[in-house]
Amino acid sequence: MKFAFAIFVVLAILHTELISATEYKCKVTGTGDMTIPFGCKDGNDVQGCKKLCQEKCKYTTTRQSCVGKKCYC
């Protein structure tokens, strides 16, 4: 019974980590730029990046870029 409970706890923790990894978290860099990990579908998703910067982070700027899946604005 303890073994089954331990497995349940581990699965619950993994599930929580996976959900939080898919949330868009706005982070400000030391240079004042905003970054959003996993904010771009690909390196060309600048419009999606711009939308996230404005709606999710409440951050407006004239330039947005995607490097891999990371959004910079």
From Swiss-Prot:
Keyword Signal, does the record have it? yes
- What is the protein's major site of localization? secreted
Signal peptide per UniProt: 1-21
Query: From which domain of life does this come?
Result: Eukaryota
* Keywords, comma-separated and alphabetical: Ion channel impairing toxin, Potassium channel impairing toxin, Secreted, Signal, Toxin, Voltage-gated potassium channel impairing toxin
Q: What is the effect of changing R63A?
A: Reduces inhibitory effect on host Kv1.3/KCNA3 activity
Task: Tell me the compartments it is located in.
Answer: Secreted
Q: What else is known?
A: Exhibits anti-inflammatory effect in mouse carrageenan-induced paw edema assay. Attenuates delayed-type hypersensitivity reactions in a rat model. Reduces migration and invasion of NCI-H460 cancer cells.
**Known role:** Salivary protein that inhibits host voltage-gated potassium channels Kv1.1/KCNA1, Kv1.2/KCNA2 and Kv1.3/KCNA3 likely via a voltage-independent pore-blocking mechanism. Suppresses expression of the Kv1.3/KCNA3 channel in lipopolysaccharide (LPS)-stimulated mouse macrophages and human T-cells. Down-regulates secretion of nitric oxide (NO) and inflammatory cytokines, such as TNF-alpha/TNF, IL-1beta/IL1B and IL6, in LPS-stimulated mouse macrophages in a manner dependent on Kv1.3/KCNA3 channel blockage.
Name of this chain's protein: Salivary protein FS48
Question: What is the species of this protein?
Answer: Xenopsylla cheopis
